[in-house]
Protein backbone atom coordinates (compact mmCIF):
# COMPACT_ATOMS: atom_id res chain seq x y z
CA UNK A 1 0.00 0.00 0.00
CA UNK A 2 1.48 3.37 -1.04
CA UNK A 3 0.43 6.97 -0.58
CA UNK A 4 0.00 9.54 -3.37
CA UNK A 5 3.77 10.22 -3.40
CA UNK A 6 4.63 6.53 -3.78
CA UNK A 7 5.80 5.99 -0.19
CA UNK A 8 4.95 2.63 1.36
CA UNK A 9 2.45 3.12 4.19
CA UNK A 10 1.12 -0.42 4.49
CA UNK A 11 1.17 -3.98 3.30
CA UNK A 12 -1.11 -6.97 2.94
CA UNK A 13 0.54 -10.33 2.59
CA UNK A 14 1.32 -13.79 3.81
CA UNK A 15 4.43 -15.63 4.91
CA UNK A 16 4.23 -19.43 5.08
CA UNK A 17 1.19 -20.10 7.32
CA UNK A 18 0.75 -16.48 8.51
CA UNK A 19 -1.24 -13.61 7.00
CA UNK A 20 -0.82 -9.96 7.91
CA UNK A 21 -1.94 -6.40 7.28
CA UNK A 22 -0.20 -3.28 8.55
CA UNK A 23 -0.41 0.49 8.20
CA UNK A 24 1.98 3.23 9.30
CA UNK A 25 2.43 6.96 9.00
CA UNK A 26 5.50 8.33 7.24
CA UNK A 27 6.79 9.62 10.59
CA UNK A 28 6.63 6.20 12.26
CA UNK A 29 9.48 3.70 12.23
CA UNK A 30 7.17 0.72 12.75
CA UNK A 31 3.62 -0.11 11.75
CA UNK A 32 1.06 1.85 13.77
CA UNK A 33 -1.64 -0.75 13.17
CA UNK A 34 -0.85 -4.41 12.63
CA UNK A 35 -3.36 -7.20 12.13
CA UNK A 36 -2.00 -10.73 11.88
CA UNK A 37 -3.42 -14.20 11.61
CA UNK A 38 -0.96 -16.89 12.60
CA UNK A 39 -1.18 -20.63 13.01
CA UNK A 40 -1.56 -20.34 16.81
CA UNK A 41 -3.85 -17.29 16.85
CA UNK A 42 -4.54 -13.79 15.65
CA UNK A 43 -3.77 -10.35 17.05
CA UNK A 44 -4.36 -6.66 16.58
CA UNK A 45 -1.48 -4.42 17.69
CA UNK A 46 -1.54 -0.63 17.99
CA UNK A 47 1.74 1.29 18.36
CA UNK A 48 2.49 4.90 19.24
CA UNK A 49 4.59 7.20 17.04
CA UNK A 50 7.77 5.90 18.74
CA UNK A 51 6.96 2.37 17.59
CA UNK A 52 6.14 1.15 21.11
CA UNK A 53 3.36 -1.43 21.42
CA UNK A 54 0.52 0.24 23.35
CA UNK A 55 -2.48 -2.05 22.78
CA UNK A 56 -2.52 -5.75 21.90
CA UNK A 57 -5.75 -7.69 21.45
CA UNK A 58 -5.18 -11.33 20.73
CA UNK A 59 -4.95 -14.94 21.75
CA UNK A 60 -3.08 -15.85 24.95
CA UNK A 61 -0.98 -18.96 25.64
CA UNK A 62 -4.06 -20.94 26.71
CA UNK A 63 -5.92 -20.17 23.45
CA UNK A 64 -8.22 -17.73 25.22
CA UNK A 65 -8.66 -14.03 24.63
CA UNK A 66 -6.24 -11.40 25.89
CA UNK A 67 -6.29 -7.59 26.00
CA UNK A 68 -3.02 -5.84 26.93
CA UNK A 69 -2.56 -2.11 27.53
CA UNK A 70 0.97 -0.72 27.87
CA UNK A 71 2.25 2.69 28.89
CA UNK A 72 3.87 5.07 26.37
CA UNK A 73 7.19 3.21 26.72
CA UNK A 74 5.68 -0.19 25.96
CA UNK A 75 5.74 -1.41 29.60
CA UNK A 76 2.68 -3.45 30.62
CA UNK A 77 0.03 -1.55 32.62
CA UNK A 78 -3.08 -3.77 32.41
CA UNK A 79 -3.88 -7.23 31.07
CA UNK A 80 -7.36 -8.75 30.86
CA UNK A 81 -7.59 -12.35 29.76
CA UNK A 82 -9.36 -15.64 30.07
CA UNK A 83 -7.73 -18.03 32.54
CA UNK A 84 -6.57 -21.60 31.91
CA UNK A 85 -8.82 -22.96 34.70
CA UNK A 86 -11.79 -21.01 33.32
CA UNK A 87 -13.17 -17.60 34.12
CA UNK A 88 -11.26 -14.40 33.58
CA UNK A 89 -8.84 -12.08 35.25
CA UNK A 90 -7.24 -8.66 35.22
CA UNK A 91 -3.66 -7.91 36.19
CA UNK A 92 -2.34 -4.43 36.94
CA UNK A 93 1.38 -3.63 36.73
CA UNK A 94 3.63 -0.97 38.27
CA UNK A 95 5.98 1.28 36.27
CA UNK A 96 8.62 -1.50 36.21
CA UNK A 97 6.15 -3.97 34.70
CA UNK A 98 5.76 -5.98 37.94
CA UNK A 99 2.29 -7.30 38.80
CA UNK A 100 0.74 -5.37 41.72
CA UNK A 101 -2.95 -6.36 41.61
CA UNK A 102 -4.88 -9.38 40.32
CA UNK A 103 -8.68 -9.46 40.16
CA UNK A 104 -10.38 -12.53 38.82
CA UNK A 105 -11.74 -16.02 39.16
CA UNK A 106 -10.02 -18.61 41.34
CA UNK A 107 -9.65 -22.37 40.80
CA UNK A 108 -12.92 -23.13 42.63
CA UNK A 109 -14.98 -20.66 40.55
CA UNK A 110 -15.06 -17.99 43.23
CA UNK A 111 -13.80 -14.44 43.00
CA UNK A 112 -10.50 -13.13 44.30
CA UNK A 113 -8.36 -10.03 44.66
CA UNK A 114 -4.62 -10.26 45.27
CA UNK A 115 -2.16 -7.43 45.86
CA UNK A 116 1.62 -7.62 45.51
CA UNK A 117 4.40 -5.35 46.69
CA UNK A 118 7.19 -3.99 44.47
CA UNK A 119 9.25 -7.12 45.16
CA UNK A 120 6.52 -9.35 43.72
CA UNK A 121 5.44 -10.84 47.07
CA UNK A 122 1.71 -11.35 47.66
CA UNK A 123 0.60 -9.01 50.46
CA UNK A 124 -3.22 -9.41 50.51
CA UNK A 125 -5.63 -12.13 49.39
CA UNK A 126 -9.35 -11.39 49.50
CA UNK A 127 -11.67 -13.95 48.04
CA UNK A 128 -13.61 -17.16 48.22
CA UNK A 129 -12.05 -20.09 50.10
CA UNK A 130 -12.45 -23.88 49.70
CA UNK A 131 -15.72 -23.73 51.71
CA UNK A 132 -17.23 -21.09 49.38
CA UNK A 133 -16.94 -18.59 52.24
CA UNK A 134 -15.06 -15.31 52.45
CA UNK A 135 -11.34 -15.22 53.28
CA UNK A 136 -8.89 -12.40 53.96
CA UNK A 137 -5.21 -13.20 54.29
CA UNK A 138 -2.63 -10.53 55.15
CA UNK A 139 1.04 -11.33 54.47
CA UNK A 140 4.32 -9.69 55.43
CA UNK A 141 6.66 -8.04 52.94
CA UNK A 142 8.12 -11.39 51.81
CA UNK A 143 4.72 -13.03 51.28
CA UNK A 144 4.45 -15.08 54.48
CA UNK A 145 0.96 -15.25 55.98
CA UNK A 146 0.60 -13.20 59.20
CA UNK A 147 -3.17 -12.78 59.70
CA UNK A 148 -6.18 -14.66 58.38
CA UNK A 149 -9.86 -13.78 58.74
CA UNK A 150 -12.31 -16.38 57.51
CA UNK A 151 -15.12 -18.79 58.22
CA UNK A 152 -14.68 -22.39 59.42
CA UNK A 153 -16.63 -25.37 58.05
CA UNK A 154 -19.37 -24.94 60.66
CA UNK A 155 -19.95 -21.33 59.59
CA UNK A 156 -18.25 -19.63 62.55
CA UNK A 157 -15.93 -16.69 62.08
CA UNK A 158 -12.20 -17.32 62.54
CA UNK A 159 -9.33 -14.88 63.13
CA UNK A 160 -5.78 -16.22 63.20
CA UNK A 161 -2.60 -14.23 63.67
CA UNK A 162 0.93 -15.56 63.39
CA UNK A 163 3.67 -14.08 65.55
CA UNK A 164 6.70 -15.74 63.93
Predicted regions: what is each one?
Residues 1-164:
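Parallel beta-helix/beta-solenoid repeats that form elongated, surface-exposed shafts/blades used
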Amino acid sequence: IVDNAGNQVGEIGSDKMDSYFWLKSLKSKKAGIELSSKRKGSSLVLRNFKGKEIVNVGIDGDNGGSFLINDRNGVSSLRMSSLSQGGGGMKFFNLRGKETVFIGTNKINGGQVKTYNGLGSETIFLGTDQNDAGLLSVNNNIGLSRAVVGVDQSGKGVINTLVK
